[in-house]
């Protein structure tokens, strides 16, 4: 357990340092500093190159090129089994700090995770419901995603008492292992996994390694079948999101937490 915590802390710090938006900010600061030294020529070249990269990523559909293979890996099920034993939703969409400050449920991207979970819960009234996810913050372990989830369940007509909460996982690998320990599902059961489409390959790979052959139900799609050219600085964040997901697939395969690099539908 201690090694899991160390891995989590190291991965959080490492990503904060190498994330594309961090590197771009570092290049801007470095180039601005060089402008005031005898290396001002190099500074002009560097700042021009950095602005060019920012413009390129903000205009061209780099984020779609990176995210779309992830989102297309698992199709939305055309139909689900008549009997669904349980439904799992992974935390990650909740804006826990704003929820705590304002008293209303607040979300980052990905609120579809919870709205789809509630919808499926109404369709399958006998299914076991599981919300999986503790605080993924290095600085705030007091407020948890479940606080936001309970509020939205209440507002959506789903009794929070019907939902089981796994509150201690800090990343997707722990979502899988701790949820499995909590539920102890049998191999013949049908469990539906709800998470963002770009996050589904990594999630399914980790759940399979834990011994849980879930039915993927991807939501929160970020891409379309076509590409458009427009200037949008938010594209940098989506590009970063895609890079993070591919790095996660590489790292989890390298550490043996998944059985294949790019988990996909089973034949």
Residue ranges of predicted features:
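Hydrophobic alpha-helical segments of integral membrane proteins
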Residues: 6-14, 62, 66-70, 243-250
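Lipid-exposed faces of alpha-helical membrane segments in multi-pass integral membrane proteins
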Residues: 10, 23-30, 46-56, 243, ...
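Structural signal for membrane-spanning alpha-helices in multi-pass inner-membrane proteins
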Residues: 32-35, 54, 58, 252
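Membrane-interface helix-boundary motifs at transmembrane edges
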Residues: 35-44
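Transmembrane helix-loop junctions in multipass membrane proteins, especially transporters and channels
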Residues: 40, 69-76, 256-264
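A structural signal for short, hydrophobic/glycine-enriched beta-strand patches
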Residues: 51, 56-236
């Amino acid at each position: 357990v201690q090694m899991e915590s160390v891995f989590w802390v190291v991965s959080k710090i490492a990503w904060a340092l190498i994330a594309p938006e961090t590197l771009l900010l570092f290049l801007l600061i470095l180039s601005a500093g060089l402008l005031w030294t005898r290396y001002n020529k190099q500074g002009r070249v560097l700042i021009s190159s950095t602005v060019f990269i920012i413009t390129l990523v903000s205009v061209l559909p780099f984020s779609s090129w990176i995210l779309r293979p992830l989102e297309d890996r698992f199709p939305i099920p055309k139909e689900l089994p008549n009997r669904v034993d349980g439904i799992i939703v992974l935390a990650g969409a909740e804006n826990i700090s704003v929820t705590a400050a304002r008293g209303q449920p607040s979300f980052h991207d990905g609120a579809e995770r919870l709205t789809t979970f509630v919808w499926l819960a109404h369709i399958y009234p006998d299914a076991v419901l599981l919300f999986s996810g503790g605080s993924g913050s290095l600085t705030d372990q007091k407020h948890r995603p479940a606080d936001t989830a309970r509020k939205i369940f209440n507002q959506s007509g789903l009794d929070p008492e019907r939902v089981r909460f796994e509150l201690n996982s800090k990343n997707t690998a722990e979502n899988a292992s701790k949820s499995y320990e909590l539920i102890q599902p049998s191999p013949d059961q049908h469990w539906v996994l709800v998470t963002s489409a770009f996050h589904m390959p990594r999630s399914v790979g980790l759940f399979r390694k834990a011994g849980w052959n879930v039915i993927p139900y991807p939501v929160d799609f970020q891409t379309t079948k076509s590409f458009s050219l427009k200037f949008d600085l938010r594209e940098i964040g989506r590009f970063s999101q895609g890079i993070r997901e591919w790095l996660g697939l590489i790292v989890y395969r390298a550490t043996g937490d998944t059985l294949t690099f790019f988990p996909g539908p089973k034949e």
